[in-house]
Amino acid sequence: MDPNCSCTTGGSCACAGSCKCKECKCTSCKKCCCSCCPVGCAKCAQGCVCKGSSEKCRCCA
């Protein structure tokens, strides 16, 4: 589990727009940094939306 997030890996979560998760893997969260983003992606904090490593992030394209 991410120390900055109460979400469980791969589970549902109630992250808000202010979510500070570093590597949130919640399937229901659209505000956390995505696993398909490169490390240090500055745009993750701006609401990057993608669901997994097989999907390219629109914010990182």
Curated annotation (Swiss-Prot):
What ranges does the record give for the region Beta, renumbered to this chain? 1-29
Annotated Pfam families: Metallothio (PF00131)
Positions with a binding annotation for a divalent metal cation 6 = C37, C41, C44, C60
Q: Which GO terms describe its molecular function?
A: metal ion binding; zinc ion binding
Chain residues that bind a divalent metal cation 1: C5, C7, C21, C24
- Residues recorded as binding a divalent metal cation 2, renumbered to this chain, are C7, C13, C15, C26
Any keyword RNA-binding? no
Annotated residues for binding of a divalent metal cation 7:
C50, C57, C59, C60
| SS bonds (residue pairs) | none
Subunit arrangement?
Monomer.
What exactly does this protein do?
Metallothioneins have a high content of cysteine residues that bind various heavy metals; these proteins are transcriptionally regulated by both heavy metals and glucocorticoids.
* Domain remarks: Class I metallothioneins contain 2 metal-binding domains: four divalent ions are chelated within cluster A of the alpha domain and are coordinated via cysteinyl thiolate bridges to 11 cysteine ligands. Cluster B, the corresponding region within the beta domain, can ligate three divalent ions to 9 cysteines.
The UniProt similarity line reads: Belongs to the metallothionein superfamily. Type 1 family.
Q: Which PANTHER family match?
A: METALLOTHIONEIN (PTHR23299), METALLOTHIONEIN-1B (PTHR23299:SF51)
Descriptive protein name? Metallothionein-1B
Please spell out the taxonomic lineage of the organism that makes this protein.
Eukaryota, Metazoa, Chordata, Craniata, Vertebrata
